[in-house]
A protein has these predicted regions:
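Glycine-rich beta-strand-to-loop/alpha-helix junction loops that act as flexible
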Residues: 1, 64-67, 179-184
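Short beta-strand-loop/turn "lid" adjacent to the catalytic site in phosphate-handling enzymes
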Residues: 1-37, 75
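Short, flexible, glycine/charge-rich loop motifs used to bind or transfer phosphoryl groups or to couple energy/partner
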Residues: 11-12, 49-51, 168-169
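Glycine-rich phosphate-binding loop plus the immediately following alpha-helix
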Residues: 26-60, 64, 69-124
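A general structural motif
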Residues: 18, 56-59, 175-177
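ATP-binding/phosphotransfer module of carbohydrate and carboxylate kinases, centering on a glycine-rich
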Residues: 98-101, 105-192
């Protein structure tokens, strides 16, 4: 935290305001080859804001948004992170694929996760991969009359499996607490 605070750049932008602006540079992780690099660009501020000043233990934070991230904190320092594109992928799948007519439009209905459908999407992605799991959601709608909520739940289950594949190595570490925050559709699906 102190290292991050020391790297904050303070600027005055008189054309906007006389109040100083603090720019937080983010955090980079380069722990090996290109597959082991990652970065945080704002989530570190959320994590440090959520940390209990008395807690020096090991924790996981899972941020769900346009990019889903798992962040490992040890003794008040962010030591590892992994990021996926699942939030953007959900938007793309729901707006620019054959599934767009199969899922509810954002804001048109209240989100109600169908646990069995999330589990189905998760299992299908685990067995056949993400692309097939997404297509199977469409097949299930056409052949079995699943509702838009059930189809969206299957899509979220498939994306949750893809995230789990990326995140599970951090769950193998020692930790005392897990904090999930962000988009409700992802937190709901992750907790199934």
């Amino acid at each position: 935290l102190f290292k991050l605070a020391a790297s904050v750049q303070v600027r005055t932008l008189p054309e906007i305001s006389n109040v100083p602006f603090c720019f937080v540079p983010g955090i980079r992780f380069e722990t090996g080859g290109p597959d082991n690099t990652d970065m945080l660009r704002g989530e570190e501020a959320e994590v440090f804001g959520a940390l209990d000043s008395e807690d020096d233990g090991k924790q996981l934070f899972i941020h769900f948004g346009s990019h889903n991230k798992i962040i490992y904190v040890e003794n008040g320092s962010i030591t590892q992170a992994a990021t996926t594109l699942s939030g953007e992928l959900l938007w793309a799948v729901c707006n620019h694929t054959i599934l767009k007519s199969s899922v509810p439009r954002p804001g048109t209905i209240e989100w109600k996760m169908d646990v069995a459908s999330v589990q189905q999407g998760f299992r299908t992605a685990e067995q056949y991969g993400l692309s097939r799991a997404l297509f199977c959601a469409r097949v299930h709608q056409k052949m079995h009359g699943l509702t838009q909520q059930q189809i969206l739940s299957q899509v979220l289950g498939a994306l949750t499996y893809a995230d789990w594949q990326m995140f599970r190595h951090l769950f193998e570490l020692e930790y005392k607490k897990v904090t999930l925050y962000g988009r409700q559709v992802f937190t709901d699906a992750f907790l199934f």
